[in-house]
Amino acid sequence: MKKLIRIALCVLLGIVLIWVFTPQIPAVTVHGESEIYTREDRQSAARLISDTVNSFEGCKLYAVKYEGDEVSKKNLEYCNSLAVDGVTYSESIVFTSYFRSPIFNAGAWNPNDLYSWSWYLARTNGGEWEILTYGYA
């Protein structure tokens, strides 16, 4: 019986340690290669995504990945279809994020679930990136 209690306590301690220290690990940003966007362009878009995911209470961001020039160029028309009247974007950029939902008090999230969401951002003539939509693609 004592051995079973020790094993249960060790497992519980392991879970607590993972839960406490996992938030300390910074998210990875995979900028990839691009012939149309500078590293700073990709970083500023990824920063917007990171800030948004980090605002989701209890969620832990693991990675933000640039989906490449071809995907980004191909989605400019889609991004313009999301624009408010009178706005025409000249550039679009697409990322995928990987994050985990809260273990406890998950609310609308599935508890402790891994999410991979697509993010569509656009801008006009080198201006500031705007997040147009995100979620499951």
Predicted ranges, named:
Residues 4-113:
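Flexible low-complexity loop/turn motifs enriched in small/helix-breaking residues
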Residues 114-137:
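Short beta-strand edge/turn micro-motifs at domain boundaries
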